[in-house]
């Protein structure tokens, strides 16, 4: 069976800090996804997701965010690495949904000012992805020394990242198609 409905793969910008260097990376991923045939995307900036911080879980679910997660076939999470971890507010937003994520692909882009390209933050996110029911792909994109990768206008200065992003997106799209077929055609038990 084929499904002609375009895949929907939103990109989640996983930080709210001022001057965040993850924003150009998230925009780049949106641009690259947008070049793919039969794939739609949207940037989801967690700074724009209105969630209270004095409660947690599905009780605080934002209807717009939940609808996008329900519609998504896969996700790209662009996460900076802060002190060997991911953003606490990213976790807060992710935890606001549960069933919306089940059996959907996820790819993670790590961003850092240091040499590890967000690897430690990605490692911290992987068990969270599993607990949420997301299926992580085996390719990551690691953007190290992010301050040297994008210019002051947020444009990519280092085209060597494009083949990595291409490989990452090919795997994510394959997994998204496979999991969508399963969700739509195979009963979960």
Q: What are these language model-derived features?
A:
Residues 42-53, 99, 132-152:
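Mobile beta-alpha loop/short-helix "lid" or hinge segments that flank ligand
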Residues 106-146, 159-163:
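Short, glycine-/small-residue-rich phosphate/pyrophosphate-handling segment
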Residues 1-99, 156-189:
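N-terminal beta1-alpha1-beta2 submodule of the flavodoxin-like/Rossmannoid cofactor-binding fold
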Residues 102-103:
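His-Asp phosphorelay/catalytic-motif detector in bacterial-type signaling
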Residues 13, 18, 87, 106-109, ...:
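Short glycine-rich loop/turn motifs that provide flexible caps or phosphate-binding loops at active sites
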